[in-house]
Regions:
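Charged DNA-binding/catalytic regions of mobile-element recombinases
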Residues: 1-158
Length: 158
């Protein structure tokens, strides 16, 4: 799994922050958080959601992030330990180490159109949420055998 944060700005100049956790096996965006402030709770929310929905298999998972302060915080690391998740971090100033997230952010920004075309944070946040559901449920991906991430996951467990 990979995790990262991106920033978008509505027409009124106010910012919206998006954090995603992506499953590399299915390309599904497992959890996400949208906020007007990139504070610690914003960063912890998707990880807390992830821990609630992950099945307890006994296997240790790995979650890769950049070296942002959120991911170095003791509260973040404590949640990882509680979920038996191994932390992996990019090298300093090496965004390509987390290309799987950067690609999603690039597609989001291209497909929802210019973030400044949304009048305010609420409109932009709604567009982001709608796009994430589209990405998981309706956006066909060649890498997944021309299936959506959700279809691919369902076929894996079938």
């Amino acid at each position: 799994m990979v995790c990262d944060i991106t920033e978008l700005k509505a027409h009124d100049g106010r910012k919206v922050y998006l954090e995603i956790i992506k499953d590399l096996a299915t390309n599904q965006l497992l959890t996400w958080s949208i906020s007007q402030h990139p504070n610690l709770q914003f960063a912890l929310d998707p990880l807390q959601q992830l821990l609630k929905q992950l099945p307890h298999t006994g296997y240790q998972l790995t979650l890769h992030t950049d070296q942002g302060w959120h991911y170095q915080h003791r509260a973040w690391r404590k949640l990882l330990r509680q979920g038996n998740i191994r932390q992996s971090m990019s090298h300093r100033a090496t965004c390509l180490d987390n290309a799987a997230c950067e690609t999603v952010f690039s597609k989001l920004k291209a497909e929802i159109g210019p973030d400044t075309s949304y009048r305010n944070q609420e409109e932009l946040s709604q567009a982001i949420n709608e796009w994430i559901h589209f990405y998981n449920e309706r956006r066909i991906q060649t890498k997944l055998g021309n299936q959506t991430p959700l279809q691919y996951e369902q076929n894996l467990v079938a």
